[in-house]
Each structure stands twice: as structure tokens, then as C-alpha cells.
Amino acid sequence: MEIKTSAIVLQTIKYGDSQLIVDFFTEKLGRLSFMVRVPKSSKGKMKRQLFQPLMVLNLEFDYRPKSNLQRLRDVSIQIPFSDIPFSPYKLGISMFLAELLSYATRHEQANGALYLFIQDSIEWLDHARGAIANFHIVFMIQLSFHLGFMPNIESGMSGDYFDLVDGCFAAHVPSHVHYLNKEDSMRLVSLFRLDYKTMHLYTMSRIERNRCVEVILEYYKLHLPGFPEMKSFAVLQELFA
């Protein structure tokens, strides 16, 4: 079956001298992996630089449902980046988001709302001109909504401790260790009220920001089985020191 779809690059693994295994989140079919042969010369469309993290591409291929690795017929750039490749901060964020999405969408089928959210977020990051130190935090929070486990912050009126397992506030300290103290809980409420346009208004120290990311990653681990340690988090910790 011939498929034409837009797709977002999540991960690229070198396979031999002239091939790549590329994981995409596609608009029409969700997660798919491709075996891509890249030319050794400058000729040909399948250039290695097309498959950088979060690149938004147009794909054409013959879909084989029983195959773990699809093969591209044609590829082109849908949304050219104007700033992400040239900004160390944006590049670091894009690497973090690509790794996050690679784990978080492993079993996702076609999900138009999720795809649109990711694509719009990538475009916003590329064009952003103000402070972006909180971008990945806002992205992670909003992504949890699309994945179906967004915390219930409305319960904050009835408790001081945020329960990471149940995703809501509790009046008393939970019987397990996966909960936030009062200070972290109130900070979480403030963060959940932010969007990309207002995130610059909320200032945090390096320690506070890293703590927020650690908390949200712990929440992801509790709600997404097999969610691993994020290697790219260390890069962000250094960038926004």
C-alpha cells in the first residue's frame, strides 16, 4: 500500500557503512522504523543530514504491515529549520525531546492530535526568540495530556502532597515514596498553568529547574512501563546552568 505522510525523526542509528535505521513518528500511521540507504556521494535524495532529531519530513513508501523495517521511496523536508541547528540551547532541547518521544511513543498508533502538538511545538521552538529555559518542561507536561496520564492539578485545593502514582494531590503523606513535598507540589501547580507564550514569566534557579525535570521524568517512569533513564538530560543540565 502506497503511503504519503509527514513524519518526525526521533532516532537514527548507523547500520553498516551506508545504511541507517531511522525511527519516525508519522502522522498517518504512528510509530514506524525505516531502513534507509544513504549515498556515499553528494548525489541522491537520501542524505544523512535529513535524518537529524526532530526533522519534519515528507515520506513516500510502500507500507508493509508485517515488516519491522519499512523502506523509503522518496523523502523531502516539510519544515526547514531556521535556528535549531545553529543554537546550542535549541539543539540541546531538541535532542532531549527526541529521546523523550522515542521512549514515550514506542507503542503509539496514528494519533493526529498528538502529531500536531509535536509538530507545532517543534516549529515554536525553532522560531522562538525569547527565553526558552522552561520549554522542555512545558512540553513534557503537555505531552502527558496527549498520552493520557496528565496529572490532576485541580485536586490541589484539597491536599498538600502530590501523589505521583495516582496523579493527584493528597491531604496526607502517601504510604509509598513516590510523592512530592509541599514546596515541589506547589511549584508543579504553577508550571501546569504555563504555556509556551507565558513560560518566560516563571523564573527558577538551575537547581529548581533540574528538580522539576527529575520529578516529571519520575512521573513518566511510573506511568509508562519500561521508560528508561534519559541520557540527554545531562546535556540540558549543563546548558542551562
Predicted segments with their positions:
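Non-catalytic alpha-helical scaffolds and adjoining flexible linkers that form interface surfaces
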Residues: 1-241
